[in-house]
Amino acid sequence: MRQLINHIVNHDLFRWSVVTAMIFYRYSETCMEVTVRVGDPVTLGSGHGYHPGQKVHWYNQSCVGIGNGENTHPICTYDPPKPGRQKTMKTTPLPSPLLYECHNSTLSILHVNVSDPRNYCRRKCPPKGNCEFPTCFTLSLISRTTTRKPEQKTTLLRLKTTPNKHTQHKRSTRRTSPKDYNVTGLPKGFADSFTGNVEAHRTKDAAHSAWILIIIIIIIVVILFFFKIPQRLREKWDTKGYLYKGTDGLPTTD
């Protein structure tokens, strides 16, 4: 065990392991999962981490191949405002009716349908230099039929015992009514009211917990090497003859 610790200290394996873990986490296809109910709006991403001047592209697909320029057709692009101009938002192609709104580093889906893509990808590009590595988001849909209010239980039981054709037909058409998918006539800035989406914030916190753990490990490593704790332990073991052996195979006692 002591030889293993000595080998780790001498070759800085602990520091390299932390760097390797950060690289794998950064370039892995780890998607932030966002839970949303079918028919509700949802906001992906957050305004944190956005640097002024960045152009943000959103794709309704996985991030695989985005960096290589393969099949990269953004559904929404946030173009930061130029000095003296108002902000601009482009959707390519322009959907009808409007389904997406992007602002800074967030994408607001105004109405989530069952047929919508599950994977979304965000890529930030500074005015000069290379674009950042894309970030992946995954939608986890909850069906409306799986959740019922407590006051609806009596009505549902009554429908089972005394069926009413008119009521059942009304329920059926209500579930498939095209009005559920009507998003026209929405006020400007509609998506801004959903930036406080609770599920999105929970997902953001869960994804950032891995980075917090890595930062804590780095701080511990810096403290250890700043106070020269590994070197002191090594010198202490050297005086006790734990690290080196003489020609006879026994620990030295110099």
Swiss-Prot record:
Residues 166-176 have a biased composition (Basic residues). Its main location: host cell. One of its GO terms (cellular component) is host cell membrane. It comes from the Viruses. Keywords: Host membrane, Membrane, Transmembrane, Transmembrane helix. This is Uncharacterized protein UL10. Belongs to the RL11 family. It comes from Human cytomegalovirus (strain Merlin) (HHV-5). The gene is UL10. It is found in: Host membrane. The keyword Transmembrane applies. It is a single-pass membrane protein. Residues 163-182 are annotated as: Disordered. The chain crosses the membrane at residues 207-227.
